From Swiss-Prot:
Binds 1 [4Fe-4S] cluster. It comes from the Bacteria. Its EC number is 7.1.1.-. It is found in: Cell inner membrane. NDH-1 is composed of 14 different subunits. Subunits NuoB, C, D, E, F, and G constitute the peripheral sector of the complex. This is NADH-quinone oxidoreductase subunit B. Keywords: 4Fe-4S, Cell inner membrane, Cell membrane, Iron, Iron-sulfur, Membrane, Metal-binding, NAD, Quinone, Translocase, Transport, Ubiquinone. It is a peripheral membrane protein. [4Fe-4S] cluster binds at C37, C38, C102, C131. Disulfide bonds: none annotated. It holds the Pfam family Oxidored_q6. GO terms for cellular component: plasma membrane; respiratory chain complex I.
Length: 170
């Protein structure tokens, strides 16, 4: 959020997109979706040692209150529809963080029942590798997500009109 021009002693102007992005990056509310051992490290990240509140990150248990989902652990094909339903229940804008080798690429489980990376089903914004990644790695990934949010040029959603959507569908 760059300051455009100071106006006297009382006013500072800035772009509205920058202000909205600053507010969004300063209030990320991730929904925890722990599926395996990475969930333990995610819980450790939320402990007082790391103090996520100072970054505006507050864990939520409901998808309707969250704007970010952290997929932590092995995603099985049986669990995938549940994850997709939870993702669809989240309000826009929403972000996805893949935590751990299993969520990023399937990990060591190259089998018919494991999804080989959550990016096959959801648009992932940040990948955090490791087996399991340390709490500091998750914190670093969330800070990188904040950086990505600040660089977003289209803060107010898609600008595609209804007519353009209908034309592309035909």
């Amino acid at each position: 959020m760059g300051v455009d021009q100071p106006l006297g002693d009382s006013f500072i102007t800035a772009s509205l997109d920058g202000l909205v992005n600053w507010a969004r990056k300063s209030s990320i509310w991730p929904m925890t979706f722990g599926l395996a051992c990475c969930a333990i490290e995610m819980m450790a990240t939320g402990a007082s040692h790391n103090d996520l509140d100072r970054f505006g990150i507050i864990f939520r248990a409901s998808p309707r209150q969250a704007d970010c989902i952290i997929i932590a652990g092995t995603v099985t094909k049986k669990m995938l529809p549940v994850i997709q339903t939870v993702y669809e229940q989240m309000p826009e804008p929403k972000w996805v963080v893949a935590m751990g080798a299993c969520a990023c690429s399937g990990g060591v489980f190259d089998t018919y029942s494991v999804v080989q990376g959550i990016d096959e089903a959801l648009p992932v914004d940040v990948y955090i590798p490791g087996c399991p990644p340390r709490p500091e790695a998750l914190l670093y990934g969330l800070i990188k997500l904040q950086d990505k949010i600040m660089k977003d040029k289209n803060s107010f959603g898609s600008t595609i009109g209804l007519g353009q959507r209908l034309e592309s569908a035909a």
